[in-house]
Amino acid sequence: MSHQIQYNDFPTFLRKYFPYKVQKISLNAGFTCPNRDGTKGWGGCTYCNNQTFNPDYCRTEKSVATQLEEGKCFFAHKYPEMKYLAYFQAYTNTYAELEGLKRKYEEALQVDGVVGLVIGTRPDCMPEDLLRYLEELNKHTFLMVEYGIESASDETLRRINRGHTYADTVEAVQRTAACGILTGGHIILGLPGETHDTMVAQAGMLSELPLSTLKIHQLQLIRGTRMAHEYEENPADFHLFKEVDEYIDLVIDYVEHLHPDLVLERFVSQSPKELLIAPDWGVKNYEFVTRLQKRMKERGAYQGKKYRDSEKRVIFAEDNFTTE
């Protein structure tokens, strides 16, 4: 990556695969999670409320095809020639019997204008028979599997009730990428118990994995979640980046320690105002990106600037990660 480019952005990445504008359409295909249904735990992740990212057209009583058609109507007025990626986003989209999964994925691909799939899932929910199916599907359509990593610390993963370990992440990402499938990750910055240094060290750890893309966003406290209750009882356990500029500087430090080839899809997330407790910056996503780019220019920062330094500093322990 040229140092004239501050970071690898997702739209540029997509242009390598498509000669036209492409938009993801989020889907709720009616799945659950193993840490919700009792297989690995109850109640789900302590921070999770799926209402925060499900558009109005995402309703489980609607078929996958119906949700896609309604999503197309939502976007088509701006770009009539746009094509779409079916984004299986809500909950764990590989957590079902293989034949049922195949029906849903293939239903999505039959919708006019859909040119590929993005499948969001957990690192502990990629059985071998499904991976073999996806490997074959990948030969015929655009496909990305996006893993919810959230943290590289097992201690944090236990605290937020994820029900998997970082070793599960390493194995799943390596297995998926080895099949030639584009493999993405998602992490949250600001989870309770994590410091600036441990979060930045995490960037070096993720850079060791064969990830194609990475989504980053700030911890958001959402009404009705267990984490919101924990915050009410012990607010000192949380550092919520009340000022957006503090979070921007953390993101820059993080990005400087990432592998220079990794594609960065997102830096921030916006939850509905009626659900959000904190942080409430009042900054739209595009405004955040503008401020981030300005600050990176001021600091002379770019993705991977300190990547090799990260490799030397990261120590991975069984229950947590630290820096030298």
Report each predicted region and the residues it spans:
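Core AdoMet radical
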Residues: 51-71, 75-98, 113-126, 142-169, ...
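Auxiliary Fe-S-binding modules of radical SAM enzymes
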Residues: 2-14, 18-23, 213, 221-324
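N-terminal [4Fe-4S]-dependent radical SAM core
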Residues: 1-85, 324
